[in-house]
A protein has these predicted regions:
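Short, acidic/polar N-cap/turn motifs at the starts of alpha helices
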Residues: 10, 57, 176, 255-257, ...
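Cofactor-binding loop segments of dinucleotide-utilizing enzymes, especially the Rossmann-like FAD-
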Residues: 25, 48, 125-126, 152, ...
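Phosphate-binding loop of NTP-binding sites
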Residues: 74-77, 86-229, 233-244, 259
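Short linear Ser/Thr-Pro motifs
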Residues: 28, 44, 85, 126, ...
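Adenine nucleotide phosphate-binding catalytic loops in nucleotide-utilizing enzymes
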Residues: 14, 18, 23-25, 85, ...
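Short beta-strand "acidic-cap" motif of Rossmann-like dinucleotide-binding folds
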Residues: 42-47, 149, 171, 247
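N-terminal leader/targeting and accessory segments in enzymes
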Residues: 1-107
Length: 273
């Protein structure tokens, strides 16, 4: 067993016997519910929908998973570890109450990024993040890399953690929902732009912007941040960053990064001509 497998194994060994709740029985949580149950966690799966509407409800019950369904599905959230689905607001009263009781409230992507043994490329933005993530994954694959695509695009990556090697790359699309309160960091972070979006979910524009900034907030000197030089908000993200900053622009030249010249040619610079 290599170092990578050891780390994942240690994590799941720590989960044995722990009471773990999954809030939402959908695409991102369903594979995790099964893995945690198989690995010896005491699992509850919670969903607003009724029994007939929940995918694989009978199978989950056979695995020993306790189902908590219906409008009160978040009541009595007393588990030690709580996985929220990406679209669930971070500061729901029930989640805040769980934190006050000492629960670790987390998500699939947070755990994956913490355990991932390979280089992680993260992409976020108000527009164009899915296209950018897809292009980036294809470019890396064309360069001969084994690419694991996930996050807000594709499928959950945590169930594949044992199949990911240190020489692979993970390319993840990260929404503001996923970035809220996230303290992990991708080795390369790309922000396409930031503009008003999802303000029905976030308290205000400041909270939305702060969530987006989390993708670069915890980067180290060995990491890279790629920012939109034409977007005022993302430009401001460079202040105080420890990572190596590159920029891209359609409107003007940049000192480090890529820009579109007046002749329609794409130019790249690394601090010089």
């Amino acid at each position: 067993m290599n170092k990578v497998e050891n780390r994942a194994e240690r994590f799941f060994q720590q989960m044995q016997g722990k009471r773990v709740a999954f809030c939402g029985i959908g695409g991102s949580n369903l594979p995790l519910i099964k893995i945690f149950a198989q690995r010896g966690a005491v699992v509850s799966a919670r969903d607003r929908r009724g029994y007939q509407q929940v995918q694989q409800a009978a199978e989950l019950e056979k695995m020993g998973v306790r189902l908590v369904l219906g409008d009160g599905y978040l009541q009595d959230l007393t588990e030690e570890v709580v996985f929220r689905t990406p679209g669930m607001p971070y500061h729901l009263p029930e989640l805040d109450a769980a934190r006050r009781r000492g629960a670790a409230v987390t998500s699939e992507m947070e755990v994956f990024m913490d355990l991932c043994p390979c280089k992680v490329y993260g992409v976020t933005g108000s527009d164009g993040k899915t296209t950018t993530t897809t292009i980036l994954a294809r470019m890396l694959a064309a360069a001969g890399k084994k690419v694991h695509l996930g996050g807000n695009i594709g499928r959950p990556l945590l169930p594949d953690i044992w199949q990911i090697g240190p020489d692979d790359v993970a390319v993840v699309e990260l929404s503001s929902f996923q970035l809220t309160m996230m303290t992990c960091r991708p080795h390369v972070a790309v922000i396409t732009n930031v503009a008003p979006n999802h303000l029905d979910w976030h308290t205000d524009m400041a909270e939305y912007t702060d969530a987006k900034r989390n993708i670069v907030r915890y980067q180290q000197a060995s990491d890279r941040a790629v920012l939109n030089a034409d977007n005022t908000i993302t430009q401001g993200f460079s202040e105080g960053l420890r990572s190596d900053v590159f920029r891209f622009s359609r409107l003007h030249e940049v000192e480090r990064g890529t820009y579109l010249g007046q002749d329609g040619t794409l130019y790249g610079r690394d601090g010089g001509e």
